[in-house]
């Protein structure tokens, strides 16, 4: 999927690029697989902001995605490749031979008319989902489960891919896009191939308004605030932050500070930390 550049007819279009959406084959989503999606503006039930920089944006409906791929042994035909406003990857509409319809994350190279299936005996080809114990070492995979039957949680965004490195005992060793090598149960399922829409990383937003369409509000730097609003605030004119290291608005160290809990239970599954 290439990206389209614009002539610099305005400051907003000078560096803006957009996807050409060449892989998209259907504009209207499948109604039976939609759910309402209410905007919160980053507020909780008390009306207080719990997530900053959220608000506004175009109205969306949630697409119900099959991350579990638990319809084993039943073949499905790819009916369409669709856009999903809730994620960077595209989604594929599957029509199963028994009449059921489901969405999955569309892997790179999947086309309308292709046949996909899940289960132990599925072929090793993009879009098929198998337990890790049935996938050959060296295979590129995505949509990986952390617990058997829970549904894929890892490697789901556009262009991402992991690799099955080894199998040892009851666990598979997987190299994730971050460079981390992690052990996952061989009973967990994964989907073959790389997530589609691989040119997503080349899209340049170009202007602030486009971020507002996405529901993302401006991020104000702490150093330009008043002392009452941020630990970096205050001072006459341009001032340094006045601390050994930057902190969040609540005084916690940030920008390079390690936030992972020490002695976390899942540490024993991580063979090599991310880069």
UniProtKB/Swiss-Prot annotation:
Does the record carry Ion transport as a key word?
no
Query: Where is this chain compositionally biased, Basic and acidic residues type?
Result: 264-275
Q: Which Gene3D superfamilies match?
A: 2.30.30.30, Nucleic acid-binding proteins, Ribosomal protein L2, domain 3
- What GO cellular-component annotations does this UniProt entry give? large ribosomal subunit
GO MF terms, alphabetically ordered: rRNA binding; structural constituent of ribosome; transferase activity
Note the superkingdom of the native organism.
Answer: Bacteria
Keywords noted in UniProt: Ribonucleoprotein, Ribosomal protein, RNA-binding, rRNA-binding
Q: Isomerase: is it a keyword of this entry? A: no
* InterPro entries the record matches: NA-bd_OB-fold (IPR012340), Rib_uL2_dom2 (IPR014722), Ribosomal_uL2 (IPR002171), Ribosomal_uL2_bac/org-type (IPR005880), Ribosomal_uL2_C (IPR022669), Ribosomal_uL2_CS (IPR022671), Ribosomal_uL2_dom3 (IPR014726), Ribosomal_uL2_RNA-bd_dom (IPR022666)
Q: Where is this region: Disordered?
A: 224-275
Q: What does this protein do?
A: One of the primary rRNA binding proteins. Required for association of the 30S and 50S subunits to form the 70S ribosome, for tRNA binding and peptide bond formation. It has been suggested to have peptidyltransferase activity; this is somewhat controversial. Makes several contacts with the 16S rRNA in the 70S ribosome.
Q: What is this protein called?
A: Large ribosomal subunit protein uL2
Organism per entry: Acetivibrio thermocellus (strain ATCC 27405 / DSM 1237 / JCM 9322 / NBRC 103400 / NCIMB 10682 / NRRL B-4536 / VPI 7372)
Q: What gene does this protein come from? A: rplB
